[in-house]
């Protein structure tokens, strides 16, 4: 269902945008957007207007399990980044910007360290 909804949205956006505009939809927790904690922020932004019936576990797994959340970008030069490894400096900078303590950063970003 989530995949079908994503495809439907993709088709609607492509129909309404000029051909040269690319649409990308990086999903939190996947390689182009590996920080699972972003799900909390996305859900908080939506919770004021919508009761989606989606819950997050302590480890940011979504319930129901078929749920997915992400961001949508539309631009002629939009492309998916592939984030496999980051330096210690990038790790510390990102954690500081997100307001993560060391334990949270290690838990959700540690696998990305070179």
Label the model's feature ranges:
Residues 2-83, 89, 100, 108-110:
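Small-residue-enriched alpha-helical segments and adjacent helix-cap loops
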Residues 112-114:
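C-terminal anchoring/interaction modules
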């Amino acid at each position: 269902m989530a995949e079908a909804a994503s495809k439907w949205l993709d088709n609607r956006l492509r129909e309404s945008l000029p051909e040269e505009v690319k649409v990308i939809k990086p999903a939190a927790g996947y390689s182009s957007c590996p920080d699972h904690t972003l799900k909390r922020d996305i859900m908080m932004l939506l919770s004021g207007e919508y009761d989606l019936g989606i819950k997050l576990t302590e480890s940011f797994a979504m319930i129901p399990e078929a749920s997915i959340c992400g961001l949508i970008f539309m631009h002629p030069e939009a492309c998916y980044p592939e984030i496999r490894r980051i330096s210690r400096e990038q790790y510390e900078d990102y954690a500081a910007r997100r307001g993560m303590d060391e334990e949270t950063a290690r838990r959700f970003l540690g696998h990305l360290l070179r």
